[in-house]
């Protein structure tokens, strides 16, 4: 199957899975260290009310100037960065509450705590998130799954999906999964599809697993199955073991690709000022 067709199939699989997850609780096989458990959302992670709109209404003229941020050949758009700030806003508040016992939203985003400034921490965290996201898309570009890693292309694909779903629904067709996406839900949807397409193809780098590798990984972890006492035999969880191995290998590939995106020379001071303007 051509790679673009594999990616399209993965997109469809993610859409169907989204429907199933709403109605089913699946707990057949679990990884002993919790790898199969869905990650919980930390307290306050969804809170982004403290991030200003992208109109600059709460920022000074100087802080409203978004600096030029480039990852390789890709320019990071202002809207993309602001969305990343919103996504990491809750994590920043949680980190400073747990580490220093302060809430930046109340104590101030520009007040240093043992050398760490919440505003700068948040900006760095947002950039790290964007590095990982673009790394995943660049892997998809290498395999011909997407044309490029630009935010404009992502938005265009989202709009095409939304338009196609709306047209199908108006014609009486059945839309499996979400009928419409905002940018956050579409990013999650498409990044999952990219990962599924990559890990589902054994010919991709890092996805070929030897029997010895599978056995070693199985031996190093606990595997349980409903109705089975003790550790489940390898033959009964081999598929899950391989899936987990490929998932971890893919995540490591993304991490390595993200690390290769050099941000040393980014205009950090200007970015901090812009970020402070969003939090003002």
Swiss-Prot record:
Subunit note: Homodimer.
Main localization (coarse): secreted
Top-rank lineage group of the source organism: Bacteria
One CC-aspect GO term: extracellular region
Biological source species: Bifidobacterium longum subsp. longum (strain ATCC 15707 / DSM 20219 / JCM 1217 / NCTC 11818 / E194b)
Keywords tagged on the record: Secreted, Signal
Function: Chaperone required for active expression of the lacto-N-biosidase LnbX.
Coiled coil residues, start to end: none
This protein's name: Chaperone for lacto-N-biosidase
Localization terms from the record: Secreted
Keyword Secreted (UniProt): yes
Signal sequence annotation: 1-37
């Amino acid at each position: 199957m051509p790679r673009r067709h594999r990616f399209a199939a993965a997109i469809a699989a993610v859409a169907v899975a989204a429907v199933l997850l709403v109605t089913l609780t699946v707990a057949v096989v679990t990884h002993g260290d919790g790898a199969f458990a869905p990650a919980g959302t930390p307290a306050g992670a969804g809170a982004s009310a403290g991030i200003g709109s992208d109109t600059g209404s709460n920022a000074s003229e100087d802080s409203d100037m978004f600096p030029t941020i480039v990852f390789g050949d890709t320019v990071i758009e202002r809207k993309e960065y602001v969305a990343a700030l919103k996504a990491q806003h809750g994590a920043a508040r949680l980190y400073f509450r747990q580490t220093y016992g302060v809430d930046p939203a109340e104590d101030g985003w520009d007040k240093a705590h043992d050398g760490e400034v919440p505003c700068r921490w948040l900006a760095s965290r947002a950039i790290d998130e964007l590095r990982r996201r673009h790394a995943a898309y660049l892997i998809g570009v290498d395999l011909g799954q997407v044309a490029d890693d630009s935010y404009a292309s992502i938005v265009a694909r989202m709009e095409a999906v939304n338009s196609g779903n709306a047209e199908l629904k108006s014609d009486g067709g059945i839309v499996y999964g979400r009928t419409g996406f905002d940018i956050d839900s579409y990013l999650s949807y498409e990044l999952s599809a990219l990962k599924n397409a990559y890990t589902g193809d054994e010919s991709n780098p890092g996805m070929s697993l030897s029997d010895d590798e599978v056995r070693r990984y199985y031996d190093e972890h606990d595997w349980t199955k409903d109705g089975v006492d003790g550790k489940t035999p390898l033959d009964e969880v081999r598929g899950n073991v391989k899936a987990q191995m490929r998932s971890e290998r893919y995540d490591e590939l993304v991490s390595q690709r993200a690390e290769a995106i050099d941000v040393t020379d980014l205009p950090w001071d200007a970015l901090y000022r812009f970020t402070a303007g969003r939090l003002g």
